[in-house]
């Protein structure tokens, strides 16, 4: 379908193309209210991108909140579907404290969620759609993929204590190798305990170039099966037109209280920070009483404001 640039702006054009992409792959539009009961967010505040939430009291006396997140609302309002798959996409506004400005800001997201019998093929499709989403935004992009189970196995081998483990994971997310070594020294851990993790974090590149090394290293820590899942999830990119746009990078992390398995972030040249973020969140599903598996991602349209008109035009 042709899009008339005279009547819509760049963000609207990208949003239209993303929604069309997801519909073509069998995802159905999901619409939701602008607000939820505040308790949903207070119980899952560590899952949110920012701490602040706009609240108000409705006419029945309930404390409500303008939604700061989409995924929590979808998980809460959908039911498990044993033996089947729910494929949903959304175009919604969220209300968060912006890191670039004081106070709250309305931010637009387009994304998708896949819930139910999520298998390797489903994960591979979601990764492909994440890459295609970035390409619709700009040809100069990179999708970084990791596996939190593998990362967790390496960190567990260093520090079983949760507080130390979280500090190491935070450094891993920043690729702060000196910070990891410093934490190990401060907590009197075995000399060289962090060496394998540092080797893992140093493996950065296309799946073809780094997966053999990752699988070999993961086997030493009992994470061979998870390395196999990572390999299968990205195998479809090898030899294709997107191969050089996919990088394995274990600094793509998420909160292990909510996320598990595959995690990924998308970047576009000239824009600081990720414009796309996603991953598997089976742990969040369990926390909210759900049995389904789940994976999804969001594209942060407000981050694309810096793109020029030329960059936001489909090649």
Question: How would you label these PLM feature ranges?
Answer:
Residues 137-140, 144-155, 161-164, 178:
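Extended alpha-helical scaffolds
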Residues 7-25, 37, 69-82, 89-139, ...:
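Positively charged, Gly/Ser-enriched RNA/tRNA-binding surfaces
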Residues 30, 144, 247-249:
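General small-molecule cofactor/ligand-binding pocket signal
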Residues 32-51, 146-156, 252-261:
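Beta-rich nucleic-acid/ligand-interaction surfaces
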Residues 1-67, 124:
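TRNA-binding/sensing appendages of the translation machinery
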Residues 66, 146, 299:
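A conserved hydrophobic position in a structured secondary element of the catalytic/binding core
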């Amino acid at each position: 379908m042709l899009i008339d640039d005279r009547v819509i702006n760049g963000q609207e054009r990208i949003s239209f193309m993303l929604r069309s992409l997801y519909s073509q792959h069998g995802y159905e539009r999901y619409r939701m209210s602008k607000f939820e009961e505040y308790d949903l967010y207070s119980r899952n505040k560590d899952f949110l991108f920012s701490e602040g939430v706009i609240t108000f009291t409705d006419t029945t006396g309930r404390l409500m909140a303008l939604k700061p997140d989409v995924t929590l609302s979808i998980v809460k309002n959908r039911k498990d579907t044993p033996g089947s798959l729910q494929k949903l996409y959304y175009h919604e506004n969220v209300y968060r404290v912006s890191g670039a400005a004081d106070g709250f800001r309305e931010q637009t997201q387009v994304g998708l969620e896949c819930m139910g019998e999520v298998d390797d093929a489903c994960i591979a499709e979601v990764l492909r759609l994440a890459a295609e989403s970035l390409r619709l935004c700009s040809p100069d992009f990179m999708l970084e993929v990791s596996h939190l189970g593998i990362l967790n196995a390496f960190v567990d081998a260093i520090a079983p204590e949760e507080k130390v483990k979280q500090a190491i994971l935070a450094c891993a997310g920043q690729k702060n190798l000196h910070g990891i070594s410093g934490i190990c020294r401060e907590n009197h851990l075995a000399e060289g305990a962090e060496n394998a993790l540092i080797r893992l974090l140093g493996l950065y590149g296309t799946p073809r170039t780094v997966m053999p090394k990752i699988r070999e290293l993961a086997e030493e820590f009992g994470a061979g099966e998870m390395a196999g899942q990572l390999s299968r999830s990205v195998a479809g990119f090898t030899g294709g037109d997107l191969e050089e746009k996919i990088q394995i990078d274990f600094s793509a992390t998420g909160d292990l209280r909510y996320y598990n398995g595959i995690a990924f972030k998308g970047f576009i040249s000239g824009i600081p920070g990720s414009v796309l973020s996603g991953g598997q969140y089976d742990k969040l599903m369990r926390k909210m009483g759900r049995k389904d598996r789940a994976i999804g991602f969001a594209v942060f349209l407000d981050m694309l404001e810096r793109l020029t008109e030329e960059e936001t035009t489909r090649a």
